Amino acid sequence: MKKIYIRNHAAFAGKWIYEGFYAAWKSRGFLPIYYNTLDEISGDNYDLMAIDHDIQTSAHLEVIRRADRTYLFVQPISFPKPWGLHPNFISQMPQQFREEVRGLSNVHKWSFAKTQEIEYYSEWGEIETVHLAYDSLNYKLEDNSCYEYDVCYVGGWADNGFNEKRSIILEHLGKFKNSSLKCAFAVNRGISHEQENLLLSRSKVALNIHDAYQRSLGLDLNERTFKGLALSGILVTDSVRVFSEVFPEMPTYQNSSEMIDLVEHYCSLPEHELADIRQFNQKEVLENHIFNNMNRTQIS
């Protein structure tokens, strides 16, 4: 059984995202092993899912070289202000190593963002865009024939260095204060995997809110996009350009007023209409946007 080392993410969205990759590799017959630093990896005959800022020394670069194949998640070299002023948004790999990595034939560079149209990633060379997906191995649709909630939201403040998400979430969820909708909002509650699975499955509508940079640049989607569509089947999400490219038939909202109007619209529909929409959306996700469907990406 071939080993594949996967960067460990202990918290936040990265935890759930890389658990999805872990389960996908395991389902394909690999032996996935989490690592915290590249110093932990020795020997040969392994594949590797690494992150650019893991590579800080020549020894780290050697671990990349020794891998049969390295799937390297890369950050941009520069980024629009204000976000580009914070180290969270740009690559921390030393330039000399970046130049060496570009010449390694065993390194497959990828990003969640649509990088082909922008200059921020140009020093990396060719990069594959791998949008996030639904983890169909760790999440399972529960019986939703009897809904407990009209609308749900599960997420955190996710401070990316500018603490923008908190005010966005408060504004949007505050719109429901005087509505008659039955709401289930879990923000920074640390609910269990099982609770989240059940909450999304038992809600008519799943709400989605992206970060400010995602709204502005429109290059990538959050994990909640795919969980909401797969488990609830009805997603009300903000307008992000790449969402409309990936899911062209799904409406989006431009502001919090449009958001609540769209939620109320869905909740007013007859059940048979909701069921048709739900079935269409869930089929789209399960066929084209799951971690263990490796045909959706060149990561294989």
What label would you give each PLM region?
Residues 254-272:
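C-terminal "capping" alpha-helix adjacent to the active site of nucleotide-linked donor transferases
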Residues 268-300:
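A charged, aromatic-enriched C-terminal amphipathic alpha-helix characteristic of glycosyltransferases
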